[in-house]
Amino acid sequence: MTRIGTPLSPTATRVLLCGCGELGKEVVIELQRLGVEVIAVDRYANAPAMQVAHRSHVINMLDGAALRAVIEAEKPHFIVPEIEAIATATLVELEAEGFTVIPTARATSLTMNREGIRRLAAEELDLPTSPYHFADTFEDYSRAVQDLGFPCVVKPVMSSSGKGQSLLRSVDDVQKAWDYAQEGGRAGKGRVIIEGFIDFDYEITLLTVRHVGGTTFCAPVGHRQEKGDYQESWQPQAMSPKALAESERVAKAVTEALGGRGLFGVELFIKGDQVWFSEVSPRPHDTGLVTLISQDLSQFALHARAILGLPIPLIRQFGPSASAVILVEGTSTQTAFANLGAALSEPDTALRLFGKPEVNGQRRMGVALARDESIEAARAKATRAAQAVVVEL
């Protein structure tokens, strides 16, 4: 039976969030609504989730000793990683010592590294994936490209949000794709995965929640990416009943193998009735921001319920819905957003401005959300709302 105490008192139920981006911010808001005391931790001050947490700490998240010191001082009931770049070996140790990591320390560890999760899916679970090779050197990488042929995709084994990812179409792309992958990895230069290109019809994120009552799926989320970065998403993505059933089978197999409780974003490629596993995040997914307008329980509310052991009897989907990101390019520590009245002038629209303290280059600073009679209309409406926002640097 779940029991939640009073925040900032001896009875408090404490959650420590590792990583404080826009997804973490929404998770904190949902936990706050349930009376949970939230401690936010990230590598820079005033990160979005810190702005809505009870208190925060700034540390190098890859420094195991620093992470351990904060966790031992705060004594959280739940440790919730929101990003991949964390000292996962320390989380494994802390879990063995009695701390609860969401969903599990093993899941966090395996999914931090594309190699761990790909080998689990393809070799242990025998799920359909693209053909692949791993390489540590340019020579091994070149051989892998030759073996798989063009087009193929290269990614650092440790990166997030599409960083370092390239589609190779010819020999001319081989060197520059290698260089870009080496720049984009989270741990600097290193190992890459080379994947044979799947000529898919579309890709989806199947938001899958493991909770006290079992496993529940949200309606499939379709999305469009550029250079591996999400630009827009929509729900529900139209699929054949056979493809949807196979997607749920694959998502259940992967999330069951990872274990624990929480929401997972399972990325899949679809062609006709065929389904291939791509990746999984053991936490809310950026493409799932659409659920802030498309469902009665957003992916963040679902994650909060699952973490706390609360039931999820039903997820109500409100019909064709879409999200479009607000990308900002430039350098500023005092970004402002104008023309918001125009952005919100149509019915069934919403905005989320993330409150990121700075932009240096290109950064996702907000998202526009919309519902309409069809997916096409919802996408167009969300894009209009996003484009109406005037950014002042």
Curated annotation (Swiss-Prot):
Q: Does the keyword Magnesium apply?
A: yes
Quote a single Gene Ontology cellular component term: cytosol
Give, as one word, the top-level EC class: ligase
In what pathway does it function?
Answer: Purine metabolism; IMP biosynthesis via de novo pathway; N(2)-formyl-N(1)-(5-phospho-D-ribosyl)glycinamide from N(1)-(5-phospho-D-ribosyl)glycinamide (formate route): step 1/1
The processes (GO biological process) annotated in the record are: 'de novo' IMP biosynthetic process
Q: Which reaction does it catalyse?
A: N(1)-(5-phospho-beta-D-ribosyl)glycinamide + formate + ATP = N(2)-formyl-N(1)-(5-phospho-beta-D-ribosyl)glycinamide + ADP + phosphate + H(+)
EC numbers: 6.3.1.21
Positions with a binding annotation for ATP: R114, K155, S160, S161, G162, K163, G164, Q165, E195, G196, F197, I198, E203
Q: Which residues form a coiled coil?
A: none
Spans traversing the lipid bilayer: none
| Metal-binding is among the record's keywords | yes
Q: Record-annotated residues binding N(1)-(5-phospho-beta-D-ribosyl)glycinamide?
A: E22, L23, E82, D286, K356, R363, R364
As for what it does, the entry says: Involved in the de novo purine biosynthesis. Catalyzes the transfer of formate to 5-phospho-ribosyl-glycinamide (GAR), producing 5-phospho-ribosyl-N-formylglycinamide (FGAR). Formate is provided by PurU via hydrolysis of 10-formyl-tetrahydrofolate.
Q: How does it assemble?
A: Homodimer.
Which PANTHER family does the record associate with it?
FORMATE-DEPENDENT PHOSPHORIBOSYLGLYCINAMIDE FORMYLTRANSFERASE (PTHR43055:SF1)
Q: What is this protein called?
A: Formate-dependent phosphoribosylglycinamide formyltransferase
**What is the scientific name of the source organism?**
Pseudomonas fluorescens (strain ATCC BAA-477 / NRRL B-23932 / Pf-5)
- Gene (UniProt): purT
